[in-house]
Structures are given as structure tokens and as C-alpha cells.
């Protein structure tokens, strides 16, 4: 898997091409190994470039589509924040919708990772 380091996080460089429910996206992240998880909505927003669109992203690996965050809505725990990298818009949707997952892990986990 190709990755890129941005602001103390290691990001998947590309999604795997599969849209999943939130539950299945969380499971997918754990299959990647040590420390991998879904990003928070704040982490996803940090890579949005609002001066461009399709994709609205500061880096080249963003597909212009919806991606899951790990951030639940404060008013309704059935809803999760998602981001659309086509325009950088942020909203929430139900957990059973199917979106892409772009996983991250902290740099500390990368430094502590031992190849087997």
C-alpha cells in the first residue's frame, strides 16, 4: 500500500476502490495493521483546498467523491460526518450509506511499527 505523510499523519495514498458502510469501513481500517483508523472530520477538512474543485484537495491522491470520517453527529448518533472531495463540502449521513474510506495513522505508530 502506498502512503503519504501529511501533518503528522500517515494517509493511504489511494482508496481501494470499494465503497462501504461505516461499520465495514472501520473493519477495513483494522485490517491494514498497526494504528490504522478512519480520520476525524477535522483531519479530512485539513486536506481540503477550497481554492479548487474536482478534486478540492491539497494533495494529488483525492478522488472527487464522498469519504467517511470517524466523527459522529453530536445531535444524532445514527449520523456520521462525511466529506465530498469534489467541492470540499461537509455534511452528515446515515451509517448504512456506502462511501469510500481513506485511512490514517499517527506518525508515532509508523515509527514504532516493526516489519515482520
Model-identified regions with their sequence ranges:
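An exposed tryptophan-centered "aromatic clamp" motif
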Residues: 21-35, 41-93
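Extracellular structured ligand-interaction cores
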Residues: 65, 98-100
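Structured loops at beta-to-helix junctions and adjacent beta-edge loops in soluble globular domains
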Residues: 14, 70-71, 86, 104-106
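Extracellular adhesion/carbohydrate-recognition regions
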Residues: 1-36, 79-82, 100-104, 111-116
Amino acid at each position: 500500500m502506498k502512503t503519504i505523510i501529511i501533518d503528522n499523519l500517515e494517509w493511504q495514498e489511494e482508496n481501494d476502490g470499494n465503497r462501504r458502510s461505516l461499520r465495514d469501513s472501520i473493519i477495513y481500517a483494522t485490517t491494514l495493521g498497526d494504528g490504522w483508523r478512519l480520520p476525524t472530520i477535522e483531519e479530512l477538512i485539513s486536506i481540503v483546498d477550497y481554492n479548487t474543485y474536482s478534486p478540492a484537495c491539497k494533495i494529488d491522491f483525492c478522488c472527487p467523491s464522498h469519504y467517511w470520517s470517524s466523527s459522529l453527529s453530536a445531535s444524532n448518533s445514527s449520523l456520521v460526518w462525511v466529506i465530498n472531495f469534489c467541492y470540499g463540502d461537509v455534511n452528515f449521513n446515515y451509517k448504512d450509506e456506502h462511501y469510500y474510506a481513506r485511512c490514517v495513522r499517527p506518525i508515532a505508530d509508523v515509527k514504532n511499527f516493526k516489519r515482520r
